């Protein structure tokens, strides 16, 4: 399995890091077979899997449950788990308790925190305690209410300079990688050049050190409306819907189960009492 050292070496070697979200064992298993370098159990599961309209309602219990499933499905892949909304903004003791659950109970290999200079001290204390941390700057979904919605960050020079300062603060605090979301490609390239740890982009251009996308967006699974930065490589929803509709039709018409899908008995006593044939 790859490690934090591996990812830093990949940056030095110029090998892009392929990161993908997963929220359950079957998805994680397929991601591992496909050769994904790193799996993110994102709090995006709130919207993608749990039916919420934001990431805010997602709990530590949710993240523990889904991380366990992902680790069972992809035991040989490095797994990063999101710290949910407001789970790392109070006392460090409380933050450490949440991190302990995600690493020890759920089996995550690292945690991801949203924020820059404002959370650098927390990141520093976590990394000093031996916790691998991934940072997340730019468009931070947990803060969309403050940011004014899902919009591109860092377009103005002042915003870009702040994001550079955020990335520098996270690197100095010990983060081994930083996710940069929804920023101009020029800023994504600058961050990859100026920061010594991997910059993993999502809507940050092609010159970052890696890319991350949501599993369901990549395969076109219930993702009719996607962000500009998403490329859908297939569309499984119509195939799934067609299969389910065919199943319903077969049941209604008694076309399923067929003989190939049924069991039988040749016990003459049973047949004498209850009837039926021996086929």
From Swiss-Prot:
Keywords, A to Z, come to: Cytoplasm, Magnesium, Metal-binding, Pantothenate biosynthesis, Transferase
Question: Does the keyword section mention Magnesium?
Answer: yes
Instruction: List the CDD domains.
Output: KPHMT-like (cd06557)
Which residues hold 3-methyl-2-oxobutanoate? 43-44, 82, 112
Q: Where in the cell is it found?
A: Cytoplasm
Question: What is the protein's quaternary organization?
Answer: Homodecamer; pentamer of dimers.
* The protein, known as: 3-methyl-2-oxobutanoate hydroxymethyltransferase
Organism name: Shouchella clausii (strain KSM-K16)
